Design a protein with these regions (language model features):
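Short, small-residue-biased leader/transition segments that mark boundaries at the very start
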Residues: 1-8
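Surface-exposed acidic loop/strand-edge motifs in secreted or periplasmic proteins
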Residues: 16-110
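A short local loop/turn or secondary-structure capping micro-motif enriched for an aromatic residue
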Residues: 55-56, 93-96, 131-132, 157-161
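Beta-propeller blade signature
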Residues: 73-77, 139-144
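Short hydrophobic/aromatic-rich beta-strand segments that constitute the beta-sheet cores
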Residues: 85-86, 123, 149-152
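Acidic, glycine-rich flexible loop segments
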Residues: 96-137
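Short, low-complexity, Pro/Ser/Thr/Gly-rich segments in the mature regions of secreted, periplasmic
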Residues: 143-165
């Protein structure tokens, strides 16, 4: 498939971020910290996702020449006081899944808890062109023992499709 087919347009534009702009004209997304609890295979889990603009990452410049600070996102999952995952993701974490040209001008925008499946705990991540509706949806699956696998999310245009057995 062509790389362009992996890029989706958002339906709801509210997602567009409120950026702050500093003296150097660099735009930053706000720091966000979201906590979730869920049960997986009979155990209680707590998860925290902290997104922060990370000045150690290369600055992203869009076609208009606006400059953006890319984000790093820390995912922590604990169960019964034990750490299952404590990992920092950057857009480079997904380099093997995202077209290099898209990668260059995009930022790691977000990571949210999605669902649990027999394979593990699933988080949805997105790499996007800053302040646009173009993004690549990605998924992070964490197994019960903390192994992490990354995949590109294939968004089904037709939700009525059933998987053939």
């Amino acid at each position: 498939s062509s790389a362009a087919s992996d890029v989706y347009k958002r339906q709801d534009i509210q997602v567009l971020m409120k950026d702050s702009v500093d003296a150097n004209g660099l735009q930053r997304m706000q720091v966000s910290d979201s906590k979730t609890s869920f049960t997986y295979k009979g155990k209680e889990y707590q998860s925290s996702v902290v997104r922060r603009p990370d000045d150690s990452l290369p600055v992203v410049i869009n076609e208009q020449g606006d400059k953006f600070v890319d984000n790093s996102i820390t995912l922590r999952i604990t169960s019964g006081g034990k750490s299952i995952v404590d990992k920092v993701f950057t857009k480079e974490s997904f380099a093997s899944l995202v077209d290099a040209k898209f990668m260059k001008h995009s930022i790691l925008e977000g990571l949210v808890y999605d669902k649990t499946t027999p394979q593990g705990i699933v988080y949805a991540a997105s790499v996007c062109y800053p302040q646009s509706d173009l993004y690549i949806p990605l998924s992070i699956t964490v197994s019960a023992d903390g192994k992490i696998s990354l995949a590109k999310e294939e968004l089904l245009e037709d939700l009525h499709e059933t998987d053939s057995i």
